[in-house]
Structures are given as C-alpha cells and as structure tokens.
C-alpha cells in the first residue's frame, strides 16, 4: 500500500501513544504486547495515509463543519483530521475507547 499522505502528530497524540506504550510495557509488564500494539497502530496509520476517508466521521455537536474521523486500534480510538489540500493526516488523539467522547471532542475542537 503506497501512502499518498504524510502524517503529523499533535503533541497530545504523541503523548497519548507514549503513555499507552509505557502502560502496556511497564505497568502491565508486557513489552511484547506493546510492540504488537505499535505494529497494529502503524498498520492503521498506513491505511489512513493511503485512504484518508477510511475512518468514520466523528458526529458530535461540538464539532460543526469538521472532518474529524476515527479508526479503531485494538481497544483504542485514533482521532485524525485529513487535510486534502496539503495531503496530510493530523493525528489528533489516541485514546482508550471507553473515554468520555464529549470531553475529548471539546479538546479536539481547539486544535
């Protein structure tokens, strides 16, 4: 699969990924699972870079006229914003799937 788009992590998304990998590797004492999660994450990100609209649109009253999308990575949700003109994927957040969506969307809205 050839990537058409480049990706860019927000500082929060970078911190999210670091936190998840540390939690799995250190807190759960399972570095193999952390490596597996990273592999799955990169596979999803590669798919998104090839087909930016592959994820479903996040529908929420706090996001009017936005194209923020989401894709699953295991028990986590990857939130991203495709920029068609710049051919760039902005990785906004990577969060545990049961987190409060309204709270998250308010944060993303200030991107």
Regions found by a protein language model. Name each.
Residues 21, 49-56, 102:
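Short amphipathic alpha-helical interaction/hinge segments
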Residues 1-40:
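Arg/Lys-rich, positively charged N-terminal/basic patches that mediate binding to nucleic acids
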Residues 73-77, 81-111:
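Enriched for short, Lys/Arg-rich terminal
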Residues 2, 52, 58, 90, ...:
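Residue-level signal for pocket-adjacent positions within structured domains
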């Amino acid at each position: 699969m050839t990537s058409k788009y480049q990706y860019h992590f927000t500082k929060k998304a970078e911190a999210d990924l670091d936190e998840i990998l540390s939690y799995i590797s250190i807190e759960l004492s399972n570095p193999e699972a952390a490596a597996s999660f990273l592999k799955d994450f990169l596979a999803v990100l590669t798919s998104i870079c090839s087909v930016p609209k592959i994820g479903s649109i996040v529908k929420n009253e706090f996001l009017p006229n936005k194209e923020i999308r989401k894709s699953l990575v295991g028990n986590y949700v990857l939130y991203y914003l495709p920029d068609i003109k710049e051919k760039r994927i902005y990785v906004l957040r990577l969060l545990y799937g049961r987190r409060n969506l309204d709270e998250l969307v308010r944060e993303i809205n200030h991107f």
